[in-house]
């Protein structure tokens, strides 16, 4: 279920999220502060910092306890009722945030903004404020992100046109990498565009959210946030964009349409609000021209299992099968390309040129991949540092990235004439400053903490003042160690320890059995009781308090100096941000090129010819996912050809009508040709012996069966809706694959629909298409439609058994072998026998006489008949049984020879 977040004061919280509870007339200062902060952030779960915990109250606590499976307790009273409360440790908060975000919740993180000691001195509650709004589309932490997937925030703006010609502007950003894109489309193309972008969160105007036409489909997105209309105001869009990018005019940015600018401005406005004024570095918006990528509707993406299987898993998808990348950034770029295949033959050729370099030079390929393995995720490290969320390891990531850039350049220098994409990548790798790398190398210690607040990340000897402060701190700690030994001697408690935590500070700890000794005279004059636990008793001393103050002061000074150094290094990195981002993109590009080259070499893929023709000629085509599965099982994949190119004197592509039995491989053949076209336009080599493909502008797939009960649609209705979309939208350049159209209704209805659909594809759409069917009557259309070609999947029948050969040949099938497949599936023998009887009767009757057929066929006499006898075993089954009955270890040589002759005698006689 989607959830709606409102962060604008003009919009009331939606009904499915809790409104802030009204504060009573008299509450504690802490709860008064909580109510004030909660009222300013409606529609979000408030993580309210209390010491080492984030605590949630009222409805927030009830929601979080259910979502996270944590205990719901209570804290004080509100209007005479217990206040529900739950909490999570600060140090483990990322785990809990990840689970809440994955469930569609939004969170406001409220931190303590002063030291509790300062609040006590003021005799007031600790100051707190919201420092971050966490929403599904604005994540930056590695712990909250999928390393191999982009995390997009999408803004959608609409412009009303006359006669229903509305236009949609879209802008999407990934603040974790800085990517920023815009495009414009018609309302009819919105669903395909949304499926391609696959946003983690979408923002729309409240009017669009409530729109009768588009609202329902928008609300199906994983997370959608309605905002006030002014956020999408095109009149102020340019000013807001110029302000964000700190430029005087839009001249330096892409030439955006008014609608694209409105969506782009909405994006940066939302980022400003959720990041509370901290601006992540974004690339200037890149404008995607209309028609620049292959249009693929949501149903086709799902049916072809491009990035996820129908079960929602990455494993088993096309992306999983072809992803040989070694970096997270490379995996993200490959997924982007697979989601948006190009329609520009020249741009595709440039990508293929980059892959070919590493196909023909396997040694260089492996050298580059080795260098890439050392390249960290620089883009995301940069984003975290710019937002103040980075840590020492992010600094190290950028240092290591520059080192990897040098290694990559050294290897790529072997190329005397690198193709355009590789040359551009090499230029980008030269951009980062080597002086910056040296500075980071001098500053950073070898063993780095995750958080900068933990300290210890600056190398000894980097800064003299820090070294001196550390010596003072460490000397005080040696005093504590000596004090522990002295206290143990004075008390006679050899197990006495001096420990530290954030609540008590330094304290003396003994086991429970020794606690009474320290609380009794004369030791109680020195040891002051602080806390009793189940197995330990804790004390402090005046001397320990003095030492703690010295250690704290020295430690605080050391940490303060380290944080100053961190900020100084982060500022240097921000200055070099554009160069570092360019290098990060170059790493991703090289990773994709080398990964696709490895795939091509390992799996025997070939470079496709992609041009502006209407050709579609595949020789020895294979299904990339099925082939890998069969290879793991030690079985071969049967390759097949497919030629949908226009024939002599024909201006349009062909339609193949494919017949054959179930389980013969028709659906695999259909899908593999669609995937080959998609891979070719992605810029990948393809699983074939040869492939020539004229640009496909739209890809349609109507394969498989599924209902849509939520919308009240039956399986047949879903099939018809998808078929209607194909027949209404397919262009001459489209590639269409259709499987079993018309199967979900009465035979003659289904046959009629399939018949008419083929005629429409041939005469109106005039596109390249593959049409699989069990309606063998349709093969007669080839005599009437000149571009319709009959093909069949070859099978062999042997003594009542059917053998699937998976070979596609010219011709047509006259049988579907459904009963044989049913037998293989394990249907009871009596059912199989009865099915054969019914089939014989059906085939003997005139199918044009349904009344006579029904009267003649005793379908309702089953209950009056004796159960059918199981069919006798076939000769093949008898032969298998005879072999299974043999026990070779128990046979003498003579008996074994006799058994062999007996088996030979059972073989069917052949002429």
Swiss-Prot record:
Gene3D superfamilies: 1.10.1420.10, 6.10.140.430, DNA repair protein MutS, domain I, MutS, connector domain, P-loop containing nucleotide triphosphate hydrolases. One of its GO terms (cellular component) is cytosol. CDD domains: ABC_MutS1. ATP binds at residues 660-667. Pfam families: MutS_I, MutS_II, MutS_III, MutS_IV, MutS_V. The keyword DNA-binding applies. Keywords: ATP-binding, DNA damage, DNA repair, DNA-binding, Nucleotide-binding. PROSITE patterns: DNA_MISMATCH_REPAIR_2. InterPro entries: DNA_mismatch_repair_MutS, DNA_mismatch_repair_MutS-lik_N, DNA_mismatch_repair_MutS/MSH, DNA_mismatch_repair_MutS_C, DNA_mismatch_repair_MutS_clamp, DNA_mismatch_repair_MutS_core, DNA_mismatch_repair_MutS_N, DNA_mismatch_repair_MutS_sf. One of its GO terms (biological process) is mismatch repair. GO terms for molecular function: ATP binding; ATP-dependent DNA damage sensor activity; damaged DNA binding; mismatched DNA binding. The keyword DNA-binding applies. Belongs to the DNA mismatch repair MutS family. HAMAP family: MutS. This protein is involved in the repair of mismatches in DNA. It is possible that it carries out the mismatch recognition step. This protein has a weak ATPase activity. PANTHER family: DNA MISMATCH REPAIR PROTEIN MSH1, MITOCHONDRIAL (PTHR11361:SF34), DNA MISMATCH REPAIR PROTEIN MUTS FAMILY MEMBER (PTHR11361). This is DNA mismatch repair protein MutS.
């Amino acid at each position: 279920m989607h959830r709606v977040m409102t962060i604008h004061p003009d919009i009331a919280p939606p009904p499915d999220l809790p409104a802030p509870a009204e504060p009573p007339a008299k509450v504690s200062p802490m709860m008064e502060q909580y109510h004030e902060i909660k009222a300013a952030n409606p529609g979000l779960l408030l993580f309210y910092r209390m010491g080492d915990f984030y605590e949630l109250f009222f409805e927030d606590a009830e929601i979080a306890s259910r979502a996270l499976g944590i205990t719901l307790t209570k804290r004080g009273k509100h209007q005479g009722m217990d206040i529900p409360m739950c909490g999570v440790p600060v140090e483990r908060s990322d785990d809990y945030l990840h689970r809440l975000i994955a469930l569609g919740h939004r969170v406001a993180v409220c931190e303590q903004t002063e030291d509790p000691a300062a609040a006590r001195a003021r005799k007031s509650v600790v100051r707190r404020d919201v420092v971050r709004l966490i929403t599904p589309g604005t994540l930056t932490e590695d712990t909250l992100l999928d390393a191999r997937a982009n995390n997009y925030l999408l803004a959608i703006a609409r412009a009303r046109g006359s006669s229903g010609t509305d236009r949609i502007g879209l802008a999407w950003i990934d603040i974790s990498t800085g990517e920023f894109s815009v495009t414009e489309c018609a309302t009819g193309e919105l669903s395909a565009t949304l499926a391609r972008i696959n946003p983690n969160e979408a923002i729309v105007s409240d009017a669009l959210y409530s729109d009768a036409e588009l609202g329902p489909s928008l609300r199906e997105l994983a997370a959608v946030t309605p905002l006030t209309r002014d956020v999408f105001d095109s009149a102020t869009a340019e000013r807001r964009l110029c302000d964000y990018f700190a430029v005087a005019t839009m001249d330096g940015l892409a030439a955006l349409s008014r609608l694209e600018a409105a969506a782009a401005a909405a994006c940066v406005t939302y980022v400003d609000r959720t990041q509370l004024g901290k601006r992540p570095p974004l690339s200037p918006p890149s404008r995607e021209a209309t028609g620049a990528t292959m249009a693929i509707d949501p149903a086709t993406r799902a049916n072809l299992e491009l990035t996820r299987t129908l079960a929602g898993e990455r494993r088993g998808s096309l992306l999983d099968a072809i992803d040989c990348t070694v970096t997270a950034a490379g995996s993200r770029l490959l997924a982007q390309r697979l989601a948006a295949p190009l329609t520009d033959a020249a741009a595709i050729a440039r990508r293929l040129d980059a892959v070919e370099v590493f196909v023909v030079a396997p040694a260089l390929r492996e050298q580059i991949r080795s260098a890439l393995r050392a390249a960290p995720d620089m883009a995301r490290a940069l984003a975290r540092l710019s937002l103040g969320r980075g840590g020492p390891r992010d600094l190290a990531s950028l240092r290591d990235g520059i080192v990897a850039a040098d290694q990559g350049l050294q290897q790529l220098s072997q190329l005397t004439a690198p193709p355009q994409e590789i040359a551009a990548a090499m230029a980008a790798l030269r951009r980062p400053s080597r002086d910056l790398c040296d500075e980071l190398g001098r500053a950073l210690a070898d063993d780095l903490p995750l958080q900068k607040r933990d300290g210890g990340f600056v190398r000894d000897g980097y800064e003299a003042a820090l070294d001196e402060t550390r010596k003072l701190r460490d000397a005080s700690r040696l005093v504590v160690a000596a004090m522990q030994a002295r206290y143990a001697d004075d008390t006679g408690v050899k197990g006495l320890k001096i420990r530290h935590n954030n609540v008590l500070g330094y304290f003396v700890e003994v086991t429970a059995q020794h606690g009474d000794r320290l609380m009794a005279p004369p030791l109680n004059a020195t040891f002051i009781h602080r806390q009793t636990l189940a197995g330990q008793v804790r004390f402090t001393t005046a001397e320990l308090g003095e030492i703690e103050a010295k250690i704290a002061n020295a430690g605080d000074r050391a940490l303060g100096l380290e944080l100053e150094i961190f900020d100084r290094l982060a500022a240097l990195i921000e200055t070099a941000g554009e160069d570092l981002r360019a290098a990060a993109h170059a790493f991703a590009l090289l990773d994709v090129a080398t990964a696709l080259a490895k795939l091509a070499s390992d799996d025997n893929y070939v470079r496709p010819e992609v041009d502006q023709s209407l050709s579609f000629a595949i020789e020895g085509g294979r299904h990339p996912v099925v082939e890998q599965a069969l290879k793991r099982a030690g079985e071969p994949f049967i390759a097949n050809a497919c030629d949908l190119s226009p024939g002599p004197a024909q201006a349009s592509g062909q339609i193949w009508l494919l017949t054959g039995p179930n389980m013969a491989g028709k659906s695999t053949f259909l899908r593999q040709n669609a995937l080959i076209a998609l891979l070719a336009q992605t810029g990948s080599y393809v699983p074939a012996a040869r492939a020539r493909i004229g640009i496909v502008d739209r890809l349609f797939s109507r394969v498989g069966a599924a209902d849509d009960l939520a919308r009240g649609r039956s399986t047949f209705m879903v099939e018809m809706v998808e078929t209607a979309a194909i027949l209404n939208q397919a262009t001459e350049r489209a590639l269409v694959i259709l499987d079993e159209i018309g199967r979900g209704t009465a035979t003659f209805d289904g046959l009629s629909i399939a018949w008419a659909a083929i005629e429409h594809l041939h005469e109106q759409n005039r596109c390249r298409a593959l049409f699989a069917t069990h309606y063998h009557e349709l093969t007669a259309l080839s005599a009437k439609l000149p571009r319709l070609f009959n093909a069949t999947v070859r099978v062999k029948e042997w003594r009542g058994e059917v053998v699937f050969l998976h070979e596609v040949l010219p011709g047509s099938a006259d049988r579907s072998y459904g009963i044989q497949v049913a037998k293989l599936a394990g249907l009871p023998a009596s059912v199989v026998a009865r099915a054969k009887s019914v089939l014989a009767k059906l085939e003997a009757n005139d199918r044009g006489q349904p009344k006579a057929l029904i009267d003649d066929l005793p379908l309702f006499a089953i209950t009056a008949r004796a159960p059918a006898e199981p069919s006798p075993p076939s000769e093949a089954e008898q032969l298998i049984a005879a072999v299974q009955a043999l026990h070779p270890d128990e046979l003498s040589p003579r008996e074994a020879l006799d058994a062999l002759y007996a088996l030979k005698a059972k073989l069917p006689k052949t002429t």
